[in-house]
Amino acid sequence: MQITVVGAGIVGISTAYALAQEGHQVTLVERNPGPGEGTSYANGGQLSYSYVAPLAGPGVLSHVPGWLLRRDSPLRLKPSLDPVLLRWGLRFIAACNRERADRTTRELLALSFYSRARMEALRAASPDLSFSFARRGKLVVYRDAAAFASARAQVGYQATLGCEQHALSADETIAREPALAGARGAIVGAIYTPDEDVADCHQLCVGLFNRLCALPNVALRFNAGAESLWVEGRRVRGVRTAHEPITADAVVVAAGVASAGLLGPLRIDPGLYPLKGYSISLPLGEGGAGSDGAPVVSVTDAARKIVYARIGRTLRVAGMADLVGWSDRLDPRRVQTLYDETRALFPAALRASDAGADAAPWAGMRPATPTGVPVVGPSPVDGLWLNVGHGALGFTLAMGSAGLLADLIARRAPAIAAAPYALAR
């Protein structure tokens, strides 16, 4: 089958790779000059297979008024009459209940566990694929006793779904990650997950791209973003780029937030809105792990919604969720918040990186659905497939989403239930 995949971020390029491995004739279309240059470029770097609790949780609405009044709030909302934002917001509010949050957790865990299995299979089959992968575990630290109690309850629920997680006291947390010693008075405890990973998402995109380049059944079209989907009747015929139309038997839309603009004229609404996130990448000193002030274990500050991941000789600091429209312009105030929070939690790491010199501030537009569950599967247009809406979990869920979509396109029974990720759900 001739299949065109739109988008070469981690979701799109994983999809193209999975389809090419099955022998399809694959054309990968991307507006940027290279792979992984959008939201996949400098994300948080955490492969959080067990920590998938949705933003739309039962207690989140009570925090929103306070968040909106804080300069350093983990969530920022720009007042707007944008009907897309209003519709997204109403759906988000409707999802902020225990029943829906538990269901979302189950659905995301099923996809993330499958994604981990496929990532491990990829690494086993490609030992020379270098993307700074490391399994060091993850600590989610809490500053508030009530929030920590809620997290412990979530651990109990996720244990019934196959997750291995442990609640640690503040002292146990610091024993697990000594770089947190300076925050002893600020944290009350943490949830530790031993089998979580870190890696460089952009490096993996480049590695998969290089493998695609070597395959005879793959064509690559970069600097050639899809301007529209070519549909006749209710059947897809291909995509139209600025340079040429590309015919196809099937088209997969995996273009992040840009997917909304492609699908809108067809009146297909996967419920996407960009959650803008930020990162800095701090070069670490020559002392090595344990002496450069940076954590070895991945750390998430639950209250601040900021993650810290050691990726090679870099400390990636990323986070926040801004609902501020469709521009990826850097907000220097949000970047400064990342510096300030790093200085408060890991001051030695910031000093070791020469006070943040060459930290490459970055912003990315994470394509989020209101519930946090991506849309993976067919559309109402015959031959048009969707792989969109992974939010902050794109890196975590990419391999599983690609495998699920490959199963569905091949008309075979998928490895996991497909219904939770369908457009009509």
Curated annotation (Swiss-Prot):
InterPro entries: DadA, FAD-dep_OxRdtase, FAD/NAD-bd_sf. One of its GO terms (cellular component) is cytoplasm. It catalyses: a D-alpha-amino acid + A + H2O = a 2-oxocarboxylate + AH2 + NH4(+). Its cofactor is FAD. One of its GO terms (molecular function) is D-amino-acid dehydrogenase activity. Pfam families: DAO. Keywords: FAD, Flavoprotein, Oxidoreductase. The keyword Flavoprotein applies. Oxidative deamination of D-amino acids. HAMAP family: DadA (MF_01202). Belongs to the DadA oxidoreductase family. PANTHER family: D-AMINO ACID DEHYDROGENASE, SARCOSINE DEHYDROGENASE-RELATED. This is D-amino acid dehydrogenase 2. It comes from Ralstonia nicotianae (strain ATCC BAA-1114 / GMI1000) (Ralstonia solanacearum). The lineage of its organism: Bacteria, Pseudomonadati, Pseudomonadota, Betaproteobacteria, Burkholderiales.
